[in-house]
């Protein structure tokens, strides 16, 4: 399961490359302020922007059902956040450099939970 989670997160990070999928700002101010950016694959990012980067709080939504709601730093998931998976599973906790890093809880769709300290996407047991 750990490899599955890491694979999904790495896939999301790779697929979220701004340069590979940029379309444009569709609402608000995506330079410095609050705005909505839509990518060519229909992935969206809404909320805070600083110097054209996702920075502060935001919501990133993929057409395949993944939704990240939380903090960004220089367009990377960093701080507190929740990643919701299409199957209903979630990770709620700390992020750094785009990975689960710090205290967090992974909850499977069936309600089973694993909590603890995560490092680079892996639960430290």
Predicted features and spans:
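Positively charged n-region of N-terminal signal peptides that target proteins for export
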Residues: 1-4
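Bacterial N-terminal signal peptides
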Residues: 7-15
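Glycine/tyrosine- and acidic-biased, solvent-exposed loop/turn segments at the edges of beta-strands
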Residues: 15-125
């Amino acid at each position: 399961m750990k490899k599955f989670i890491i694979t999904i997160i790495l896939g999301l990070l790779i697929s979220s490359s701004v340069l590979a999928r940029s379309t444009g700002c569709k609402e608000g101010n995506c330079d410095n302020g609050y705005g909505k950016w839509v990518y060519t694959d229909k992935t969206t990012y809404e909320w805070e922007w600083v110097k054209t980067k996702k920075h502060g709080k935001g919501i990133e939504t993929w057409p395949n059902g993944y939704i990240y709601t939380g903090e960004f730093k220089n367009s990377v998931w960093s701080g507190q956040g929740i990643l919701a998976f299409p199957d209903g599973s979630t990770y709620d906790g700390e992020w750094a450099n785009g990975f689960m890093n710090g205290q967090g809880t992974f909850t499977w769709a069936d309600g089973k939970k694993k909590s603890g300290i995560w490092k680079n996407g892996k639960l430290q047991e």
